[in-house]
């Protein structure tokens, strides 16, 4: 099969497009014929990209791209809940090879039926971003009707789903984005959009119940001051310098695969409640452009196979 391989520690410049062995599913694994995989540039900084769960180094080459859409090509004898030929979307375990290849391995608990209303390229940007938004706002912050939520990076992959989900939960949604994306973010359901380039959000926002930070650094540090007493900040951006601070560690989380949540997200998408935001779609062999051309909205996607 063809795959995009990371042969050494580095960034997109360390990727190559080469032949690789087609994976074989174990008893509890699903082999997916990948049709689209989303680009997540932060994978180059993820711990699991270069380490095994025991802390030892992962051998190279490594395949990135841990959210995908495709069709089940084979299943192990112990698999239940999926059948060969099913159109699915989902995630891989962080510590195994990803989906920037013709085929990838996962487990039944990490995939769900692809939303019927979406093409594979659209579905591929959903799993990580939508589950991150869900687990941040619903599982951790317990966002409820009437609460005020501030979402940083609202035009991005996670932020765009978070705005839509918070709007669906009937919260009052305040978002930060560029002026160029203000109307777009309002269209997703934001009640107020702050141009982060011209207006310090802390100058116009106070007493929010929840902050979802997808940016980190100074943006996160300034966000503590706009929370009401007892409010909650949730962040997916943690830098080493600040991660030593207890409140940053407590606010940080990493998304986990969740089939039930994927099914609910799929239902909401097919009902028109939420929609994915795709930056640009690139053929697999143009993978370097997909990484280097940062989208103004959503995530870029690799088109890997023809349906």
Predicted regions and their residues:
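Short helix-loop-beta connector
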Residues: 67, 116-119, 142-148
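Mid-domain Rossmann-like dinucleotide-binding core that forms the NAD(H)/NADP(H) cofactor-binding site
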Residues: 84, 124-195
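A structural motif shared across PLP-dependent enzymes of the aminotransferase-like
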Residues: 95-108
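Glycine-rich cofactor phosphate-binding loops and adjacent beta1-alpha1 units
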Residues: 174, 186-251
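Glycine-rich beta-strand-centered segment in the early N-terminal region that forms part
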Residues: 21-39, 51-95
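C-terminal hydrophobic helical "lid"/dimerization subdomain
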Residues: 33, 262-307
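Rossmann-fold dehydrogenase core element
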Residues: 231-280
């Amino acid at each position: 099969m063809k795959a995009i391989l990371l042969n050494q520690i580095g960034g997109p410049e360390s990727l190559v497009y080469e032949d690789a062995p087609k994976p074989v599913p174990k008893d509890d694994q699903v082999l997916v014929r990948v049709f689209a995989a989303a680009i997540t540039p932060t994978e180059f900084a993820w711990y699991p990209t270069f380490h095994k769960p025991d802390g030892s180094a992962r051998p190279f080459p490594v395949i990135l791209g841990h959210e995908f859409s495709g069709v089940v090509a084979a299943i192990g004898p112990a698999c239940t809940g999926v059948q060969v030929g099913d159109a699915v979307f989902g995630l891989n375990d962080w510590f195994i090879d990803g989906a920037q290849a013709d085929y990838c391995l996962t487990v039944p608990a990490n995939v769900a039926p692809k939303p019927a209303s979406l093409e594979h390229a659209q579905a591929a940007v959903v799993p990580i971003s939508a589950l991150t938004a869900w687990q941040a706002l619903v599982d951790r912050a317990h966002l409820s009707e009437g609460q005020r939520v501030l979402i940083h990076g609202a035009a991005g992959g996670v932020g765009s789903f978070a705005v839509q989900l918070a709007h669906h939960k009937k919260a009052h949604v305040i978002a930060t984005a560029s002026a160029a994306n203000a109307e777009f973010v309002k269209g997703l359901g934001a009640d107020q959009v702050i141009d982060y380039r011209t207006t310090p959000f802390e100058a116009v926002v106070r007493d929010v119940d929840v902050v979802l930070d997808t940016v980190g650094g100074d943006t996160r540090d300034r966000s503590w001051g706009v929370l009401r007493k007892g409010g909650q900040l949730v962040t997916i951006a943690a830098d080493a310098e600040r991660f030593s601070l207890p409140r940053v560690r407590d606010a940080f989380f990493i998304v986990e695969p969740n089939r039930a949540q994927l099914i609910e997200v799929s239902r909401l998408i097919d009902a028109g409640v939420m929609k994915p935001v795709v930056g640009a779609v690139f053929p697999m062999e143009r993978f370097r452009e997909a990484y280097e051309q940062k989208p103004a909205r959503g995530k870029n996607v690799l088109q890997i196979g023809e349906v």
